Amino acid sequence: MAIYVTSDIHGDYKKYIQIFDKINFTDDDTLYVLGDVVDRGTGSIKILLDMMCRFNVIPIIGNHEYMAYYVLSKLVEEITEETLASFNEDFLVGMLSWTNENGGENTLKEFQKLSLENRQAILEYLEEFTPYEEIRVNGTDYILVHSGLSNFKENKPLDSYTIDEMIWARADYNKIYYKNKILITGHTPVSVILNDISADKILKQNNHIAIDCGCGYGKNLGVLCLDTMKEIYI
């Protein structure tokens, strides 16, 4: 039985599906996906449909799932002139931001090809994404969250953070958040953290593990086994 974490797959179905062969994934193992499964790539919905069928793949919400749900939940039914007229300016601005600026166009195209039943199933699955997970592996406590913990206080309960504080703000990787826990995040590519465009490996420092290796930009998809701390790259 092994515990794995990955993040920021960004619609790359080919790399996603290779994870399971590469780590010899079994029903006794667990894979935590720390958000941003969707957008940019062309296989976002295909990945979600596969994840839905795997009881031991645990999804954590990222800002891209948050944006996608906001838009797709309004588009689940057939779009007519009447429904278009009902969309307010805030929704239209949000939809354009997601599709044009954040890579949601491919996800939207995939979603529109689904049957009504599968559209509803995708939305119900997105509603199951948790804002964070706390786990213990080999005596070490881990907090898994998409982007970090904005307005952080060490004694602040995790369930008192807002969703925005967990999916948008970039973590400070030079700061120790917890003395006795390891914070694992995605969201910010390692190349951005290190200001090194060539960086594409998992970063471990200051009781913090950054696992976004840049898959959304054509770089590695990183997977980390918490039992052995072995790093796997696809």
Language-model regions, residue ranges each:
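Active-site glycine-centered loops adjacent to acidic/histidine catalytic or metal-binding residues
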Residues: 8, 35-36, 62-63, 186-187, ...
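Active-site environment of divalent metal-dependent phosphoester hydrolases
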Residues: 10-14, 39-42, 66-69, 187-195, ...
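N-terminal active-site segment of His-dependent metallophosphoesterases
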Residues: 1-50
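Residue-level marker for buried hydrophobic side chains located in beta-strands
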Residues: 5, 33, 59-60, 143, ...
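A general structural motif
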Residues: 26-28, 54-56, 139-140, 179-181
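Active-site neighborhood of divalent metal-dependent phosphoester bond hydrolases
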Residues: 44-47, 53-133
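Acidic, His/Gly-enriched loop-helix segments that form or flank divalent-metal centers
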Residues: 100-210, 214-219, 230-233
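Catalytic phosphate/metal-binding cores of nucleic-acid and nucleotide-processing enzymes, i.e., regions
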Residues: 6, 17, 24-25, 76-81, ...
